[in-house]
């Protein structure tokens, strides 16, 4: 199975908004990312509009449509966001948990607890052809609940693994990676497409990319940060090279 790279450009907007300016433009970063080999663009329109704006979603949708690449619209499970997505008609909609006081998304959706609300949002989004993904922890019960909710895709939260690996907590990182592998296998077995993301950098990407059922990685903050030093195309090229190396090694082991 080939492995796609979705580039999240939220933090280009973070830099823009730090000065209340009109630049740097997220759409320009998105275009550079696609030229550099990204398979799609991810953008999270948060309820507080702390980075990506409604206007950004409009121009990103137009760019991705013109280039024949998917826009993955990350969003909270609210009537407002569902309405915006229904109007934008993105290729994909990824439902994520959201709390105003958090710095970034801190965990996965509780699909079991929010089953009706999530299922209703999923059904509405699918009426306009959006491929619905649910951002979750690699928990078997949550994965099964995604099927019940009508999702086509799960995105497994890799943040805890990446944090443990960077902290040198090897045993904890290996335990979380084991859960990610089991979760990906179960989701695939249940007919769900499997994505993964959050906190991935050059040091942590290969073990995640080596999970054979994963079809897509969504990476943003690290790539935008690395782009400050080496440029966005080079940052993407190196990430893709590591992803591809992990898949080649997987084939050799098989």
Swiss-Prot record:
Site (described: Transition state stabilizer): 155
Pathway(s) it belongs to: Cofactor biosynthesis; pyridoxine 5'-phosphate biosynthesis; pyridoxine 5'-phosphate from D-erythrose 4-phosphate: step 5/5
Purpose of the protein: Catalyzes the complicated ring closure reaction between the two acyclic compounds 1-deoxy-D-xylulose-5-phosphate (DXP) and 3-amino-2-oxopropyl phosphate (1-amino-acetone-3-phosphate or AAP) to form pyridoxine 5'-phosphate (PNP) and inorganic phosphate.
Protein's UniProt keywords contain Cytoplasm: yes
Protein name (record): Pyridoxine 5'-phosphate synthase
Organism lineage string: Bacteria, Pseudomonadati, Pseudomonadota, Alphaproteobacteria, Caulobacterales
Major localization listed first in the record, in broad terms: cytoplasm
Pfam families linked: PdxJ
Binding site for 3-amino-2-oxopropyl phosphate: 8, 19, 199, 220-221
Binding site for 1-deoxy-D-xylulose 5-phosphate: 10-11, 46, 51, 104
Active-site residues (renumbered): 44, 74, 198
MF terms (GO), sorted A to Z: pyridoxine 5'-phosphate synthase activity
Location in the cell: Cytoplasm
Keywords recorded for this protein, A-Z: Cytoplasm, Pyridoxine biosynthesis, Transferase
EC number(s) stated in the UniProt entry for this protein: 2.6.99.2
Family recorded in the similarity comment: Belongs to the PNP synthase family.
Classification via InterPro entries: Aldolase_TIM (IPR013785), PyrdxlP_synth_PdxJ (IPR004569), Pyridoxine-5'_phos_synth (IPR036130)
Any GO BP annotation: pyridoxine biosynthetic process
Subunit composition and interactions: Homooctamer; tetramer of dimers.
GO cellular component: cytosol
